[in-house]
Amino acid sequence: QHASYLDQIDRDAWNPSDYATQLTRRARGLPFWFSLAVHGTDKYRAAVEHTLSIARDVAAGIEAMPHLELVKHPELSVLLFRRRGWNTADYQAWSQAAALDGSILCVPTTWRGQTVLRLAFTNPDTESRRVLDVLDAMR
């Protein structure tokens, strides 16, 4: 069998889709590569550094709130915290309500056998103050 539609058209030009692990799967690295090619590594570096800064700012804000406890300091842009006095059902209900009203996507997870909340920052346009305002309203 020969599938001519799979042949490389231009063998002299580098094409990232030729490096997919299987021809039946899309080249998952292509969107990232394209974004790097368009925006450049300096903008990516700045965006990543900004999300790390957001995570640190939010962690510091959580530590200042008496009703919250920072469980795990940020690793890259992910942190864990708990609301003092809440149980698993409380976390589930709050998380669902917050997602439905569009205020925040903050989902429960389990850390060392305890239900906690997880925040992962990936959007450099996220504003620390808005996140902290939502968390402050958990009182």
For each feature predicted by the language model, list its residue ranges.
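Conserved PLP cofactor-binding pocket of PLP-dependent enzymes
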Residues: 73, 78, 101-118
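Active-site C-terminal subdomain of aminotransferase-like
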Residues: 1-66, 73
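PLP-dependent enzyme catalytic core of the Aspartate aminotransferase-like
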Residues: 111-139
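Generic non-transmembrane alpha-helical segments
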Residues: 57, 61-65, 93-104, 137
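Conserved PLP-binding catalytic core of the aspartate aminotransferase-like
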Residues: 69-98
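Short, hydrophobic beta-strand segments
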Residues: 34-35, 80-82, 117-122
